[in-house]
Amino acid sequence: MQYLSGVEISVTWASRTIHVVGLHVDPACKDLVEGLERTRNGRAARAEAIGEQLATLGIPDAYAGALKFVSNPDMISRTHFARFMVESGYAENTQDVFNRFLGDGKPGYVAHRWSKLADAVKWIRVSGGEAVIAHPGRYAYTQTEFDALFAEFIDLGGKAIEVVTGSHTPDQYREYADVARRFGFEASRGSDFHAAGEGRVELGSLPPLPSDLKPVWERWL
C-alpha cells in the first residue's frame, strides 16, 4: 500500500463552508503550517459557541462531551458534537444530528469565517501539493454558483474534484464525473470515513473512478 501526505482545509466561499483537500503536501512547509495554525485558532472558539447554543436547546455540557471524542482539542468539529449527542440519546445517528441541530441554518449551527479559497489553494501549491475540491455534492449551491466556484478554483491553480466519495450518491458519482469532463478536472476518490456507521459506505467499499477520468494521484504513484 502506498501513502500520500494530505490535508483538508475548511474554506468560506459565497457565505458557505467548503472543504479543499491538499494531496502530496510538505507538512513542514512554513506557509502551510502557519495558514493551518490561523485556521485552527478559530475552531476552538466556534466549538465553545456551539456548546453554548446547544445548551439553550436543552442539551447541556455538549462542549465537554464533544471533547471526549477528540484526540487533539485543536481539531474539535461538529462531528465530535454529533457523536456526543448520539451517545447521550439526543439523536439516532450522526446524520440525524446534522439534519436537526448542526447543519447549516439549524438551531445549533454557529457560522465561522474560515480561510479564503485563494489562500487554501496557495498554501497547498507552495507546499508542493495539488488542490482538490472535496465532496462537492454536499454543498448547497445553485448551478450558477457551482460554475463560478469551479472556474475560480481553476484560475487559482486547482486541479481536481472528488468524484467518487462516501458523501456522494451513485447519481452524484455520475454528475461530478460529468463536471470533471466539462471543466477538464482530474478526479479523486475519498471515503470521507469518520467512524463505522457514520457514512453511506464503509472503508474499502467505494467503486473505482470512471475509466476515462485521470486520477489526480497518478503523477505521484
Specify the residue positions occupied by each region the protein language model found:
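Mid-domain alpha/beta scaffold segments of enzyme catalytic cores
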Residues: 1-45, 49-71, 75-80
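Exposed alpha-helical structural elements
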Residues: 31, 65, 80, 96-97, ...
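Divalent metal-binding pocket/active-site signature
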Residues: 44-52, 57-144
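Charged catalytic cores and adjacent phosphate/nucleic-acid-binding surfaces used
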Residues: 1-28, 36-39, 92, 115-133, ...
